């Protein structure tokens, strides 16, 4: 399950010259609300975080897709090396693009991504030349709430909900510690059962 969330940046006077390059390196993006950072997250089937990626708040979600998908590994049941391809990927409309769907199709991953309204209108406007509608499993899409609940648990930590760190690497480290805490809490709960 894949999605992203914004974190508002507080207290960033920077202390350095604020160039576009330094903003990209520090994962800062300027929008109407000021400086923001976007945290992209992939969770596994139980809603536990697997892969984090940080970008500026003004970066489009689909442009960070390949970076988010790059480093994840899924443990196998029994012996064998970890899998690099999940059975399916559930994502929101922000990740609905031809490039992402092609990426997933080539790797044999089922895409459970709703079609955006403008894509649907363009396909219908073209008629028979617009192609077939994308397959969409509405029942499987209901599992997307797992990643939203994971973000809710992560944002209980003040440093993740509101970014105070100057460097993106420190913010990512704090978010990673939050993810580790979620995994440890899950292990602790499974040991008591």
Which functions belong to the PLM regions below?
Residues 77-167:
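Helix-centered, glycine/charged polyanion-binding patches within enzymatic domains
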Residues 7-8, 56-60, 72-73, 94-98, ...:
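Short, catalytically relevant binding-site loops at active-site mouths
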Residues 174-193:
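Charged phosphate-binding loop/patch that engages nucleotide di/tri-phosphates or the phosphate backbone
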Residues 1-31, 43-46:
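Active-site- or DNA-interface-adjacent structural scaffold in DNA-acting proteins
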Residues 67-70, 152, 179-182:
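Generic alpha-helical structural context detector
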Residues 53-79:
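Active-site beta-loop-alpha junctions of metal-dependent nucleic acid enzymes
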Residues 36-40:
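Short glycine-rich loop/turn motifs
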């Amino acid at each position: 399950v894949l999605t992203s969330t914004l974190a508002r940046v507080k207290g960033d006077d920077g202390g350095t010259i604020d160039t576009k390059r330094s903003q990209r390196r520090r994962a800062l993006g300027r929008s109407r609300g000021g400086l923001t950072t976007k945290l992209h997250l992939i969770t596994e089937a139980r809603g536990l975080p697997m892969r984090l990626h940080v970008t500026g708040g003004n970066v489009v979600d689909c442009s960070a897709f390949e970076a988010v998908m790059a480093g994840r590994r899924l443990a196998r049941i029994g012996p064998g090396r970890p899998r690099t391809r999940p059975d399916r990927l559930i994502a929101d409309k922000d990740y609905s693009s031809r490039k992402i769907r092609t990426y997933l199709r080539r790797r044999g991953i089922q895409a459970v991504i709703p079609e955006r309204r403008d894509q649907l209108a363009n396909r219908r406007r073209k008629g028979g030349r617009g192609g077939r509608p994308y397959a969409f499993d509405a029942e499987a899409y209901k599992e997307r709430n797992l990643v939203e609940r994971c973000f809710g648990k992560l944002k209980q930590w003040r440093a993740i909900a509101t970014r105070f760190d100057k460097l993106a690497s420190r913010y990512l480290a704090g978010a990673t510690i939050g993810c580790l805490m979620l995994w440890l809490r899950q292990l602790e709960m499974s040991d008591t059962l």
